[in-house]
């Protein structure tokens, strides 16, 4: 009896070793997903990260990564297990024919799943513990953190990883047991060789796919604002996924049938084998090709977007901070604070830290919100095309470093933060119409870009009386801006910024009649942005690696499963007169069709999504289109090289099988 029960563990181990062509990649995938999940989970709860200045935002990004990796790991392992179990159906059927009951087969599958899980989770956790410190240091590097923070292995993360993957393997086991329980012995024997009936090209599916794909593309291209792009992007993603599956299923079949109808093309040995073989199993291939395409698109979008955010943060910071340090106050108390010498406070603090101040700018302006309708600014209809209006006298514009221009009453200088500029010859306000003497190409305390949800319009009048007259008797509040740049050591700039902003904010808090007040620094915000964008880049690279691993795994199993199905067929073709060269040519055509069409479609999806992605990145104040395009193209080039390498490696497996 004891020997009988020892038979099943031995049989399970023998099966895993004998089928190593299928089980080894699966074990590597298990170990890889465990490694990535554990690493992300360990970092998200690491006590060392809690000592960072913006630990909450970093850990929130990492926790999001834990959820995404956990869900995707379950999908990838479940999907690839389907390839694995189908390749072994004949073997399991033979066990049944030879007298093993289904409960015995189920026991073997249970033990195989247990051994696979133990090895996969064990290797993944061992690698996670081994390289955890390295990943921690990489994350700190991306976050711009130079201080040495403590790192220790988290027992909590180890336990959570074991629990999550125990659940995943339990679901996979239940799926395998269900397949065996439903099948009959001869069905198990024939399952591995079960072919697909020639699918029909459905006009409805084709039209549905075109509509979905067209709708998704339209949303991505026609979104006018960052908010529109953000709100509708995930709708576009779903439409593109549905459209991709529908068109790969029906469009590819229609194309193959068109090639088959072309007798001059079809009745050549290489074309005949490739086209007929693809058409015969197209229903299965279509789903696989669509999944590969979607995974490739996910890699390209996630990596290019996070790299763009990280690389473009310096330019984005400068758009938000025309001066290194600034104070902005709006309210009835703003004018009363004009005598509060914030600049003198800064000079004292800077001298104590060995810093110098430069490019000082200060103004008291009128700031209000209005809806722009052509040249008319409506103060009562603030709904769409919202603008922040700044009205200031010429003398203060000149004092900030602007050019001294002779302005008459009824004339204004205009600067718009919109990249296209203002573009009109007059400005109509409640107090009358004003002729635009000159549209300014630059302004001392503002930059031109489209990253903000609101356009800033600066109007320079001949004197303060003209600016107040332009309001047409409407009640307004003063706006105080004071800013300057810092010269000196970077560490001292950061320390100065923290101390100065705290002092100014405490002084401002003493005033009750203030609607808006903030003291800010490019160095403090830069530290916060580095933490947020560094966390996003780390997550993007992690997810990109995970998606790439899933892509390679699916490609590999498709090569193996198709090679096993095609082996006997190609040997038969050689026996009836086809040369090895002709067989190899037909294989090449089929492989290229199967594995490079998804890459081409993914590149198209990514480039169509680029306008929407660039608008969403504007919410993070990244608006350098040249930089974003360069990051996207570089990501496509790098991924294409990896994809070609994966294709070449897996194609060798296919050739060995069919030969």
Residue ranges and their predicted role:
Residues 2-6, 182-196, 564-565, 655-659:
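Short cytosolic juxtamembrane segments of multi-pass membrane proteins
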Residues 20, 26, 109-127, 199-206, ...:
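Selective transmembrane-helix segments that form parts of the transport pathway or gating/packing helices
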Residues 22-30, 35-39, 163-168, 197-309, ...:
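Alpha-helical transmembrane segments, especially those used as permease/efflux helices
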Residues 32-45, 79-83, 90, 116-145, ...:
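Small-residue-rich transmembrane alpha-helices
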């Amino acid at each position: 009896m004891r020997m009988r029960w020892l038979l099943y563990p031995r049989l399970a181990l023998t099966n895993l070793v004998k089928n190593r062509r299928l089980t080894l990649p699966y074990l590597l995938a298990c170990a890889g997903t465990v490694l990535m999940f554990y690493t992300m989970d360990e970092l998200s709860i690491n006590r060392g990260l809690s000592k960072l200045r913006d630990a909450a935002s970093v850990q929130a990004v990492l926790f999001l990564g834990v959820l995404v990796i956990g869900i995707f790991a379950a999908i990838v392992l479940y999907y690839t297990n389907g390839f694995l179990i189908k390749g072994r159906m004949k073997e399991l059927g033979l066990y049944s024919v030879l007298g093993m009951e289904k409960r015995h087969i189920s026991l073997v599958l249970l033990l195989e799943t247990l051994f696979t899980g133990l090895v996969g989770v064990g290797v993944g956790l061992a690698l996670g513990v081994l390289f955890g410190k390295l990943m921690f240091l990489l994350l700190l590097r991306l976050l711009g953190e130079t201080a040495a923070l403590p790192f220790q292995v988290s027992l909590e993360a180890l336990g959570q990883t074991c629990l999550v993957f125990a659940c995943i393997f339990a679901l996979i086991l239940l799926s395998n047991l269900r397949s065996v329980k439903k099948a009959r012995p001869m069905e198990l024997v024939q399952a591995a060789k079960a072919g697909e009936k020639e699918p029909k090209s459905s006009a409805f599916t084709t039209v549905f796919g075109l509509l979905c794909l067209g709708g998704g593309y339209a949303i991505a291209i026609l979104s006018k604002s960052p908010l529109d792009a953000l709100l509708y992007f995930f709708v576009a993603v779903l439409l593109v996924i549905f459209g991709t599956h529908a068109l790969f299923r029906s469009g590819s079949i229609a194309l193959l049938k068109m090639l088959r109808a072309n007798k001059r093309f079809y009745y050549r040995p290489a074309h005949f084998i490739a086209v007929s073989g693809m058409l015969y199993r197209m229903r299965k291939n279509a789903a696989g090709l669509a999944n590969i395409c979607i995974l490739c698109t996910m890699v390209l979008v996630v990596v290019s977007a996070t790299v763009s955010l990280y690389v473009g943060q310096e330019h984005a910071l400068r758009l938000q901070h025309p001066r290194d340090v600034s104070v902005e106050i709006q309210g009835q108390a703003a004018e009363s604070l004009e005598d509060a010498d914030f600049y003198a406070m800064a000079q004292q603090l800077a001298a104590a830290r060995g810093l110098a101040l430069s490019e000082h700018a200060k103004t008291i302006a009128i700031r209000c919100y209005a809806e722009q309708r052509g040249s008319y600014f409506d103060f009562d209809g603030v709904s769409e095309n919202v603008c922040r209006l700044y009205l200031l006298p010429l003398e203060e514009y000149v004092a900030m470093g602007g050019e001294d221009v002779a302005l008459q009453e009824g004339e204004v200088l205009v600067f718009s933060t919109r990249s296209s500029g203002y573009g009109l010859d007059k400005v109509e306000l409640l107090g009358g119409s004003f002729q635009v003497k000159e549209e300014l190409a630059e302004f001392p305390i503002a930059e031109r870009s489209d990253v903000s949800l609101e356009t800033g319009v600066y109007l320079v009048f001949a004197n303060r009386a003209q600016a107040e007259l332009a309001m047409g008797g409407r009640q307004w509040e003063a706006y105080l801006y004071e800013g300057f740049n810092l010269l000196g050591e970077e560490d001292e700039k950061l320390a100065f910024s923290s101390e100065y902003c705290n002092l100014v904010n405490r002084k401002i808090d003493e005033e009750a009649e203030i609607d808006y007040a903030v003291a800010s620094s490019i160095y403090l915000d830069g530290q916060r942005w580095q933490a947020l964008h560094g966390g996003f880049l780390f997550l993007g690279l992690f997810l990109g690696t995970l998606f790439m691993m899933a892509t390679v795994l699916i490609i590999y199993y498709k090569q193996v499963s198709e090679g096993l199905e095609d082996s006997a067929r190609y040997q038969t073709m050689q026996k009836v007169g086809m040369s090895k060269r002709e067989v190899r040519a037909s294989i090449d055509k089929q492989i290229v069709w199967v594995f490079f069409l998804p890459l081409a479609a993914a590149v198209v999806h990514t480039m169509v999504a680029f306008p929407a992605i660039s608008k969403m990145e504007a919410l993070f104040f990244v608006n350098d289109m040249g930089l974003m395009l360069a990051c996207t193209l570089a990501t496509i080039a790098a991924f294409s090289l990896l994809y070609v390498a994966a294709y070449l490696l897996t194609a060798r497996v296919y050739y060995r099988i069919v030969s």
